[in-house]
């Protein structure tokens, strides 16, 4: 990497741009091509593995369907076959049942049974090899050993027809024999051979003992070999990659639960790579086209950059040789065009600068001569300044003595003002306290006025209530007078009634008694009314007495209100006068404080003037020394002016090498 960077650094800008553009163009396209190829390969891999799994599952379902039907049939016959049927004189009923079953199930090669004594019945009835004993056969032994459970044998060739079959066997329910069904695997072989995974991939079925059940390239019953078989037998289902006969393959497998057979679907990895090749070829074509188009575009871009740069390099060389009349013509509107304009502006600025330098050189030469003459005049003026400073220093010392005397008098005046300010502050504080006390008294009087008003209002309300009682009492008196009149009339009526009753004789006696009772009640009512009237008269007298007292209280309350109003006004005037006095005292205190502060400022200013005067004396002495130093400096300036004049001549000679017109 370091070598590549060093090579780029040593090359021209054209090659640097070319390498940079090609890197930016090629690297992303190459990465995109690789990614597209890998993505296509992964997608094809998933599709083919999905197809393999689907085919494996279909074969598994076919096995379940075929074997499941035969298991159901075996279970049916194991219950139908009994010891009585085996011991019958003829097995015609068994043969007829088997014939019906064979006619319905075309994938059954034969169905047969044997009891424990070896009596064998089969349909179709084909000749068996000599010495054939069904009780010694594996299918019989396995069925008896599993006691009523269905057993499935590995594929084998029958002794009678040499056909590859699978036997499904089961012991009868009463244990008197075994029923067995030979199912051909021809349909399973055809279905397996029809399965295509990709173009070369295939499916197969094998037993747990690695023997072929169905395989497009191997005979049924053949034992398969290879390390990859252990991966299939170590798990119920899954997928893995393996190598067989130098070919890289990938397999998906599953296990049939009824038989324990392994069902596998294998595909060649080369097919995935071959299927993904068109994607890679297309990516390479796109890469080549992109590179060609990119080179054309890059060439135009690089030329648009390098051509103005070459013009700038040539013009820069001529300017470095002193030719400031050089200009550059770049018409592009990009950064290079701006650079060309800036370059021309720089050349113009340099020309102006050289003009200015030449003018300045002439001015410097003339100024140096004037400076030499001015230095001589300044030296003479400095001598006069030195004499004047000495005279000023003597007068300044007398002024310092006068300032110190004035400062002492100001200090004494400042002490008096300070004492006056403190006294005025004490008086002001006392006035403020008086104002606060007067204000509190005014508030108390105001509260008293409010309370007196409340009392006045209550007295007036009570007076109104008593007057109402007087009116009601008079009304009651009038009512009692009416009652007395009624009682008198009732008494008179009772007398008249008694007289009339006496006249009536015996008939009016009862009425006479009633009239007497009425008269008595009238007399009692009149007496009670008189007593009530007497009480009412006394109440009216008491009410009149209360009214007189209320009027007296009301007058006293009014007198108290007038007095409290006058007192409140007096407190207000006291408070206002006290506030006015406090304000005046505060103004006086502020004035005294201002005078005190002003005297302090004057005192400070006097001290400051004295110190400045002393400093001025010291500075005057320093100025005198500086004046002497200035005389020496003027001599150095005169020498420097001569040197500056010679340097201006040298600078004029240097600017002559530049061509500006």
UniProtKB/Swiss-Prot annotation:
Interacts with FloT. This is Methyl-accepting chemotaxis protein McpA. The chain crosses the membrane at residues 17-37, 282-302. Residues 1-16, 303-661 are cytoplasmic. It comes from Bacillus subtilis (strain 168). It comes from the Bacteria. The modification Glutamate methyl ester (Glu) is found at residues 370, 629, 636. Residues 152-228 form the Cache domain.
């Amino acid at each position: 990497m370091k070598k590549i960077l060093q090579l780029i650094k040593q090359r021209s800008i054209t090659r640097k741009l070319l390498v940079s553009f090609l890197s930016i163009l090629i690297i992303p396209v190459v990465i995109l091509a690789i990614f597209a190829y890998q993505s296509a390969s992964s997608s094809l891999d998933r599709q083919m593995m999905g197809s393999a799994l689907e085919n494996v599952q279909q074969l598994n379902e076919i096995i379940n369907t075929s074997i499941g039907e035969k298991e159901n049939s075996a279970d049916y016959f194991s219950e139908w076959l009994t010891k009585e049927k085996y011991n019958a004189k003829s097995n015609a009923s068994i043969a007829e049942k088997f014939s019906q079953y064979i006619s319905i199930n075309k994938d059954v090669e034969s169905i047969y049974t044997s009891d424990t004594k070896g009596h064998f019945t089969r349909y179709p009835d084909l000749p068996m090899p000599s010495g054939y004993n069904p009780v010694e056969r594996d299918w019989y032994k396995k069925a008896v050993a599993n006691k009523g459970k269905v057993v499935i044998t590995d594929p084998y060739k029958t002794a009678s027809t040499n056909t590859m079959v699978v036997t499904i066997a089961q012991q009868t329910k009463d244990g008197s024999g075994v029923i067995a069904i030979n199912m051909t695997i021809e349909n399973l072989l055809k279905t397996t051979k029809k399965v295509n995974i990709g173009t070369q991939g295939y499916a197969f079925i094998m037993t747990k003992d690695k023997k072929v059940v169905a395989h497009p390239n191997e005979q049924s019953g053949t034992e398969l070999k290879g390390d990859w078989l252990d991966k299939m037998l170590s798990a119920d289902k899954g997928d893995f990659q393996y190598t067989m006969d130098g070919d890289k393959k990938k397999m998906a497998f599953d296990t049939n639960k009824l038989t324990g057979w392994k069902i596998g679907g294998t595909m060649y990895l080369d097919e995935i790579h071959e299927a993904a090749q068109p994607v890679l070829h297309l990516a390479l074509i796109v890469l080549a086209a992109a590179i060609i188009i990119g080179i054309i575009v890059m060439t135009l871009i690089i030329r648009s950059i390098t051509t103005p740069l070459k013009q700038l390099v040539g013009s820069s060389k001529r300017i470095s040789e002193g030719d400031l009349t050089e200009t550059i013509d770049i018409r592009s509107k990009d950064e290079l065009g701006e650079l060309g304009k800036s370059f021309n502006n720089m050349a113009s600025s340099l020309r102006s600068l050289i003009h200015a330098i030449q003018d300045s050189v002439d001015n410097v030469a003339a100024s140096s001569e004037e400076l030499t003459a001015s230095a001589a005049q300044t030296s003479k003026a400095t001598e006069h300044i030195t004499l004047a400073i000495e005279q000023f220093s003597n007068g300044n010392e007398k002024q310092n003595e006068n300032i110190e005397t004035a400062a002492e008098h100001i200090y004494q005046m400042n002490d008096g003002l300070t004492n006056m300010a403190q006294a005025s502050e004490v008086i002001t504080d006392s006035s403020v306290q008086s104002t606060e006390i007067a204000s509190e008294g005014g508030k108390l009087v105001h509260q008293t006025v409010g309370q007196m008003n409340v009392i006045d209002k209550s007295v007036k309300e009570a007076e109104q209530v008593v007057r109402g009682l007087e009116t009601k009492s008079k009304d009651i008196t009038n009512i009692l007078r009416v009652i007395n009149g009624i009682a008198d009339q009732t008494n008179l009526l009772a007398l008249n009634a008694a007289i009339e009753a006496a006249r009536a004789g015996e008939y009016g006696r009862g009425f006479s008694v009633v009239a007497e009772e009425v008269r008595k009640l009238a007399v009692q009512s009149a007496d009670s009314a008189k007593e009530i009237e007497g009480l009412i008269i006394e109440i009216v007298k008491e009410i009149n007495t209360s009214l007189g007292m209320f009027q007296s209280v009301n007058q006293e309350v009014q007198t108290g209100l007038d007095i409290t109003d006058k007192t409140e006004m007096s407190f207000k005037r006291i408070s206002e006068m006290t506030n006015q006095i406090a304000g005046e005292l505060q103004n006086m205190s502020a004035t005294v404080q201002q005078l005190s502060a002003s005297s302090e400022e004057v005192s400070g200013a006097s001290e400051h003037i004295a110190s400045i005067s002393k400093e001025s004396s010291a500075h005057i002495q320093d100025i005198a020394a500086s004046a002497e130093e200035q005389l020496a400096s003027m001599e150095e300036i005169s020498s420097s002016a001569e040197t500056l004049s010679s340097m201006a001549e040298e600078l004029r000679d240097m600017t002559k090498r530049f061509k500006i017109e």
